[in-house]
């Protein structure tokens, strides 16, 4: 008889495979699902899921949580709904790379797509990063969700071209510089 860390008993399991849901149990060991079905075993913690749905965490492929993650590392607007992985940096928006003179320009782009005012963004984003890697370092070790962030093309253009990024096409030299900044970011 196997002993698990967690045993979720009697829930309706939606496993993400596309197959119909089924009543069963989920065994977790060392933070990973190790078995599903009708499980005869013991656990340090048993969760009664009778009448409840059980599923893997959801992935939100389209978020603008780049700023919010700095003051809300649980991403409560997502994790309270079963989301365990978020992908910020969508629609070309990301907080980094960003030079100090461009910070308000970048924050204003978030104000336009999020229901967060510019004063709230200014108060919530504690700058201390310029590069995308430094932004990721600012998040590291604090998050309650998995984060796989994209490098926003608007931030990349602003980083290389400044205000000209919204006025004209990039030159071949600027495109080359953007490629180098992007390579350093991923």
Predicted region positions:
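Histidine-rich, glycine-flanked metal-binding segment
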Residues: 2-7, 13-57
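Divalent-metal coordination cores built from histidine and acidic residues
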Residues: 71-185
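Short Asp/Glu-rich motifs
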Residues: 46, 66, 97-98
């Amino acid at each position: 008889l196997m002993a698990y860390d967690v045993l979720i008993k009697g829930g309706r399991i939606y496993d993400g495979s596309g197959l119909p849901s089924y009543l069963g149990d989920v065994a977790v060991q060392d933070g990973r699902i190790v078995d599903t079905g009708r499980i005869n075993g013991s656990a340090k913690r048993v969760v009664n899921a009778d009448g409840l749905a059980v599923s893997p965490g959801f992935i939100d492929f389209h978020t603008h949580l780049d700023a919010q993650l700095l003051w809300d590392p649980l991403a409560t607007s997502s994790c309270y709904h079963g989301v365990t992985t978020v992908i910020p940096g969508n629609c070309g928006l990301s907080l980094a790379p960003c030079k100090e003179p461009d910070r308000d320009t970048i924050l204003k782009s978030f104000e336009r797509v999020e229901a967060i005012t510019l004063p709230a963004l200014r108060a919530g984003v504690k700058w201390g990063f310029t590069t995308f890697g430094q932004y990721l370092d600012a998040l590291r070790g604090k998050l309650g969700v998995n984060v796989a962030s994209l490098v926003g093309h608007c931030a990349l253009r602003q980083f290389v071209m400044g205000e000209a990024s919204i006025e004209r096409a990039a030159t071949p030299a600027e495109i080359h510089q953007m490629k180098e900044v992007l390579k350093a970011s991923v």
